[in-house]
Amino acid sequence: MTQFASPVLHSLLDTDAYKLHMQQAVFHHYYDVQVAAEFRCRGDDLLGIYADAIREQVDAMQHLRLQEDEFQWLSGLPFFKPDYLNWLREFRYNPAQVCVTNDNGKLNIRLTGSWREVIMWEVPLLAVISELVHHYRSPNAGVDQALDALESKLVDFTALTANLDMSRFHLMDFGTRRRFSREVQQAIVKRLQQESWFVGTSNYDLARRLALTPMGTQAHEWFQAHQQINPDLATSQRAALAAWLNEYPDQLGIALTDCITMDAFLRDFGIEFASRYQGLRHDSGDPVAWGEKAIAHYEKLGIDPLTKTLVFSDNLDLPKAVELYRHFASRVQLSFGIGTRLTCDIPQVKPLNIVIKLVECNGKPVAKLSDSPGKTICHDKAFVRALRKAFDLPQVRKAS
């Protein structure tokens, strides 16, 4: 296999916003915490043949650095603090933290090191893998095909929403990690900028260059790490929620609900958290059932759901977003994050179902259970059982 001609990544900011948001919180509160994360391909793709090309791109990432114009732009955002930005200015990717191997056709990747550094690898590394694989598998596809597919979807979307009040419909690009390519994501986002309901992107590089609002708060790893940082497993989710508010008391207040399951989350999400957080994000399980639970929870606490926002981001496309909008629009504020179905939706191209997830914190196991059994990730079945017991969940799902 010929090697990729040039580095896939051109900017340290070519990542999801929540990575920097979490990194700042880790920098301030958990500077010395050590973690391990691992790559998973949820599909049947044998990606091991790309290991050498991926390794080459990993090595090239050490040359990325925060540029002066990027530093100044980040400095103008209200939630970044000078000490963190000055540290980020000196940050460099360390390829020694990444082990990439071809295991009989299966791609294995393991990341180890300080959390404040390892946290940066996930999104750009997944984007690199996705772009490399599509480069070799679909050499004749690209921006033109992606834009043609998008235009067709927008025609259908216009027809689908012709009789709807769309003034409260808000769509975000969440497509960095599984994009067809950097160029395709940029072209898609630039086209969507023409639509009144498009409100921003999770990609900090695109947000800066296209004058868009960067979108994102925290990911599963924030909650997972607290399973070992916090001395009591049963209160670890509450500790994660409290630590986030300590770092961001009045901003970035959308909480992810499915690290343990929605039911376990709501038991921890009492009146103080529910009042202070601006809303919740759905990332697994039945979205309608989840939304109904969220609204009922707010109402039970005496909080008007119309003062809160529900963000839907699990395997969405435009028709699914419209369906959810029809169901919930009169009862709660809504935002929709669409990823793969925007940035890798090209005829004859099969998107990759790939993730990188935390598996250890300070040498001990962590787990993501979620509201979709297939998304459970943990090596240690005994720890999964302990986690389920701590959060009063039935012992039914197996770790994978």
UniProtKB/Swiss-Prot annotation:
It catalyses: nicotinate + 5-phospho-alpha-D-ribose 1-diphosphate + ATP + H2O = nicotinate beta-D-ribonucleotide + ADP + phosphate + diphosphate. GO terms for molecular function: nicotinate phosphoribosyltransferase activity. SUPFAM superfamilies: Nicotinate/Quinolinate PRTase C-terminal domain-like (SSF51690), Nicotinate/Quinolinate PRTase N-terminal domain-like (SSF54675). Pathway: Cofactor biosynthesis; NAD(+) biosynthesis; nicotinate D-ribonucleotide from nicotinate: step 1/1. Keywords: Ligase, Phosphoprotein, Pyridine nucleotide biosynthesis. Transiently phosphorylated on a His residue during the reaction cycle. Phosphorylation strongly increases the affinity for substrates and increases the rate of nicotinate D-ribonucleotide production. Dephosphorylation regenerates the low-affinity form of the enzyme, leading to product release. Its EC number is 6.3.4.21. Pfam families: NAPRTase (PF04095), NAPRTase_N (PF17767). The modification Phosphohistidine is found at H220. It comes from the Bacteria. GO terms for biological process: NAD biosynthetic process via the salvage pathway. The keyword Zinc-finger does not apply. It is an enzyme of class 6 (ligase). InterPro entries: N/Namide_PRibTrfase, NAPRTase_N, Nic_PRibTrfase, Nic_PRibTrfase-Fam, Nicotinate_pribotase-like_C. GO terms for cellular component: cytosol. Belongs to the NAPRTase family. Catalyzes the synthesis of beta-nicotinate D-ribonucleotide from nicotinate and 5-phospho-D-ribose 1-phosphate at the expense of ATP. This is Nicotinate phosphoribosyltransferase.
